[in-house]
Amino acid sequence: MATSAAAVQDEPATRFAKDQLKAIIERIERLEEEKKTISDDIRDVYAEAKGNGYDVKALRTIVRMRKQDANERAEQETILETYMQALGML
């Protein structure tokens, strides 16, 4: 007894998988939209900071550094200082 493709699509397990897949895709799409909105908001904050006279590049560096582990940040600062001394920049 052969089952047709239409019969397989209507099986409860297949219906569940289709519904689950659709829900996952819709969640991803919603999160992507939220991510875009947040990115736009962050860009606006940097523009506001620039308008108030702050250096945006320095702000981005500080934000990136604050995300790092303190030990990792200290190690990178030590390496940077060593390189700068070797180049006569300090």
From Swiss-Prot:
This is UPF0335 protein RPD_1405. Signal peptide: none annotated. It comes from the Bacteria. The lineage of its organism: Bacteria, Pseudomonadati, Pseudomonadota, Alphaproteobacteria, Hyphomicrobiales. Belongs to the UPF0335 family. One of its GO terms (molecular function) is DNA binding. It comes from Rhodopseudomonas palustris (strain BisB5).
